[in-house]
Design a protein with these regions (language model features):
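N-terminal Rossmann-like NAD(P)+-binding domain of SDR-like oxidoreductases, especially those catalyzing
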Residues: 1-187, 345-346
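Short, solvent-exposed loop/helix junctions and linker helices
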Residues: 16, 66, 105-108, 157, ...
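Residues within well-ordered alpha-helices
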Residues: 26, 50, 204, 299-300
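C-terminal substrate-binding subdomain of Rossmann-fold SDR/epimerase-dehydratase oxidoreductases
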Residues: 32-33, 64, 209-350
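Residue-level detector of flexible, active-site-proximal loop/helix-junction positions
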Residues: 44, 68, 134, 189, ...
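Residue-level signature of the cytosolic catalytic core of signaling kinases
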Residues: 46, 54, 194-198, 262, ...
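Residues in well-ordered alpha-helical elements
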Residues: 69-70, 82, 94, 101, ...
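NAD(P)-dependent short-chain dehydrogenase/reductase
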Residues: 139-144, 148, 156, 162-247, ...
Length: 350
């Protein structure tokens, strides 16, 4: 933990997507570590929003769209970062079907605008570009994907994030060699307190419990690499440190996911959480137009070996921490207190 704090103290960080769920947790942790965090993102899209509840102090903030190249360049100039953490994205599969063009321009063109701002930045940069576990060509064999697996994507979201990976690789090889240090981080199905996004399992269950209604599941048999938000965020920070230090042999792409024996179906999680929140039993309503894969798993051994990173939460532990956060918040506890408490407990184990 001392090493983590020593690295990030007073470090200038441009964090995109800081108003989102995962970005809000990252901003909070970076602030606790003493970093100077500059946020760039759209205004929060949910009510409530974790970003608004936490009120994390920032060194600077710009609420704008990644598709606005001038705004991205202005944010880079204002922040003068040493580290870039790129979280901002359209991150939902169902939303990518409703607006595929917006999904692609946000995820691919938006990232290219960031890469271009980095290309024209005067000082060397270290950047972690966060994509998703869904970048792989998924034949639903059940095998966990290593970083060397082919990229693909049948749905608009997955395809856009695979294309983002290709764009990052191109900019690194064409423009950044010997100057900027960049890696892509692949993780997904992140859970934790303070997520109110639409079309996500845990927030849907929380909302259903508040209404005393049944949550609707599209694919209860699907399995996902569920992980508590602090595990991948810890991985991203470790990755940025290693990239910045120029660690020999470090891969330019890393998976961050739970241990392979932690696979649990959507239906099992929904059953456990509806009971925990006292909500009615879930019901199944297939939506054929949403082409989500039923089986998805990541092989995160490379991150474990190269960064000495390990997921600290089991899936059940991640669920318990998530339930505790929402329960306490619904009972009147402050979001900042709950979030700081869970970050501190996580830090104590490092």
């Amino acid at each position: 933990m001392v090493v983590l704090r020593d690295f990030w103290r007073h470090r200038r960080v441009l964090l995109t997507g800081h108003t989102g769920f995962k970005g809000a947790w990252a901003a909070r942790w970076l602030h606790r570590l003493g970093a100077q965090v500059y946020g760039f993102a759209l205004p929060p899209e949910t009510e409530p929003s974790l970003h608004a509840l936490l009120k994390t102090p920032l060194a600077g903030e710009m609420l704008a769209d990644l598709r606005d190249a001038n705004a991205v360049s202005a944010a880079m100039a204002a922040a003068q970062p040493e580290i870039v953490l790129h979280f901002a994205a359209q991150a939902l599969v169902p939303a990518s079907y409703r607006d595929p063009v917006g999904n692609w321009t946000s995820n691919v063109l938006g990232t290219i605008h960031l890469l271009e701002a980095m290309r024209h930045h005067a000082r060397p940069l270290t950047a972690v570009i966060v994509t998703t576990d869904k970048v792989y060509a998924n034949n639903e064999s059940g095998a966990a994907f290593p970083e060397s697996a082919p990229l693909g994507g049948d749905d608009p979201y997955s395809a856009s994030k695979a294309a983002t990976e290709i764009a990052v690789h191109s900019w690194v090889k064409s423009f950044f060699a010997g100057r900027h240090k960049v890696g892509t981080a692949r993780a997904g199905n992140v859970i934790g307190g303070g997520d109110w996004s639409a079309d996500r399992l845990i927030p849907d269950i929380v909302r259903a419990a508040q209404r005393q209604d049944s949550v609707v599941l599209r694919r209860p048999e699907a399995t996902r690499p569920w992980q508590h938000v602090l595990d991948p965020v810890h991985g991203y920070l470790r990755y940025a440190e290693a990239l910045h230090a120029g660690k020999t042999g470090l891969s330019e792409r890393l998976n961050f996911g739970p241990l392979e024996d932690q696979r649990i179906t959507v239906g099992t999680i929904a059953t456990d959480l509806t009971r925990a929140f006292g909500a009615p039993a879930w019901r199944h309503e297939p939506q054929q137009e949403i082409g989500e894969k039923g089986v998805l798993a990541l092989d995160a051994r490379l991150a474990q070996q190269s960064l000495s990173w390990q997921p600290r939460f089991t899936t059940q532990g991640a669920l318990a921490a998530t339930v505790a956060w929402y329960r306490d918040w619904m009972s009147g506890a402050e979001a900042a207190v709950l979030t700081d408490r869970q970050i501190a407990a996580f830090e104590d184990g490092l």
